[in-house]
From Swiss-Prot:
Functional description taken from the UniProt entry: O-methyltransferase involved in the biosynthesis of ipecac and benzylisoquinoline monoterpenoid-isoquinoline alkaloids natural products, starting by the condensation of dopamine and secologanin, and including emetine and cephaeline, drugs used both as anti-protozoal (e.g. treatment of ameobiasis) and as emetic agents. Catalyzes 2-O-methylation of 3-O-methylredipecamine and, with less efficiency, the 7-O-methylation of (S)-coclaurine, (R,S)-N-methylcoclaurine, (R,S)-4'-O-methylcoclaurine, (R,S)-6-O-methyllaudanosoline, nororientaline, (S)-norreticuline and (S)-reticuline.
Activity's thermal dependence: Optimum temperature is 40 degrees Celsius with (S)-reticuline as substrate.
Major place of residence: cytoplasm
Pathway noted in the entry: Alkaloid biosynthesis
Gene that encodes the chain: OMT3
Species the sequence originates in: Carapichea ipecacuanha
Tissue-specificity statement: Expressed in roots.
Protein name: 3-O-methylredipecamine 2-O-methyltransferase IpeOMT3
Gene3D superfamilies in the cross-refs: Vaccinia Virus protein VP39, Winged helix-like DNA-binding domain superfamily/Winged helix DNA-binding domain
Positions annotated as active site in the UniProt record: 254 (proton acceptor)
Cross-referenced Pfam families: Dimerisation, Methyltransf_2
GO BP of this protein: isoquinoline alkaloid biosynthetic process; methylation
Length: 358
């Protein structure tokens, strides 16, 4: 077995660089959050052309004594790929445009949510959680569940809702353009846990003959109003799902344990008519893999869903799943005569279409 003593200097250097990249990775996301809060992407866009540091400092609401530090912030953000620098001037990259306020597909809220102190603190409590009886690291850090905390904090609730809506915008664009076949021929669809209805609205608009219903908890739909073929109803997915020939679950099941997911899927199965229908699931998909993997297997397609899996553990003690785990849930929920298709939609997010007969 190779030891530290027998490793070459080059190997030790590679190991140290890998460690440093992992350890200090959050510096990049923290810098990105800072840029979003300061409005740097919008300032550059409004300027209409690349900005030099003097112009950028003048456009931002910062303490004049901190102006000399902006170039250091921009330097790390250029390295991260959100901005480009040429001849001492900065411009937005295609990645950086996702943080513009007026971009319909912006993910500003997600950045602010992920770096919110309430969501960062549970990661620090992860080790403590492994040694206690709390339901989640979030509960260890805050003394209450994630859902109870969000409900009690209006600012965080607003940020969470905006983040979910932004995510739905991205998913909706893909579904109604590249995956229209999933909805063709359907008469009714219930978006379970659909919140403000961002995804359901897009589907209802793209398919005017499809009756769409958003079913969520009373406080989530209290201020929402339907229109045309879109409606909102208050309900609890653990008690009853409104009847329809298709049920949509976007980023719902990864919040829950296998046992709770089976309960939800059973309610979905009960909501679908005797002649059959489909459950449409939009969620992360883990790669099927063995107990080990190659030392150099560090690709984004693998790392992104694994990071999301850890986030589900930390926040709500939920989980992401691989194909075998999804199939186990379907069988556990009583989907006896069924078939399913899994198709990548956006990054590590997949569309799982479960067709079955009751």
């Amino acid at each position: 077995m190779e030891t530290v003593e027998s490793s070459s200097s080059a190997e030790l250097l590679r190991a140290q660089m890998h460690f440093s990249t992992q350890l200090f990775g959050f510096h990049y996301t923290a810098a990105l959050k800072c840029a979003v809060k300061l409005g740097i992407p919008d300032a550059i866009k409004q300027h209409g052309k690349p900005m030099n540091l003097s112009e950028l400092n003048s456009a931002l609401s910062i303490n004049p004594s901190k102006a000399p530090c902006i170039h250091r912030l921009m330097r790390i953000l250029v390295t991260a790929g959100y901005f480009a620098q040429e001849n001492e001037c900065f411009s937005l990259t295609s990645a950086g445009r996702h943080f513009l306020k007026d971009d319909p597909l912006n993910i500003r809220a997600l950045v602010l949510l992920e770096l919110h102190p309430a969501l960062v603190k549970p990661w620090i409590a992860l080790g403590e959680w492994f040694q206690n009886d709390d339901v989640s690291p979030f509960a260890t850090a805050h003394g209450k569940s994630f859902w109870d905390y969000v409900t009690s904090d209006p600012e965080l609730r607003k940020l969470f809702d905006e983040s979910m809506a932004d995510d739905s915008q991205l998913i909706a664009k893909a579904l109604v353009t590249e995956f229209r076949y999933v909805f063709e021929g359907l008469k009714s669809l219930v978006d379970v846990g659909g919140g403000s209805g961002t995804l359901a609205r897009a589907i209802a608009k793209a398919f005017p003959n499809l009756k769409c219903t958003v079913c969520d908890l009373p406080d989530a739909v209290a201020n929402e109003h339907g229109d045309g073929n879109l409606d909102f109803v208050a309900g609890d997915m653990f008690e009853r799902v409104p009847s329809a020939d298709s049920i949509l679950l976007k980023h719902i099941l990864h919040d829950w344990s296998d046992e709770k997911c089976v309960e939800i899927l059973k309610k979905c199965r009960e909501a679908i008519p005797k002649n059959g229908g489909k459950v449409i699931i939009v969620d992360k998909l883990l790669k099927n893999r063995g107990h080990g993997h190659a030392e150099n297997e560090h690709d984004e397609a693998t790392e992104s869903p694994l990071s999301c899996d850890m986030e589900m553990l930390v926040l709500v003690n939920g989980k992401e799943r691989d194909e075998k785990e999804w199939a186990k849930l379907f069988s556990g929920a009583g989907f006896n005569d069924y078939k399913y298709n899994i198709t990548p939609v956006l990054g590590s997010t997949s569309l799982i279409e479960v067709n079955f007969y009751n």
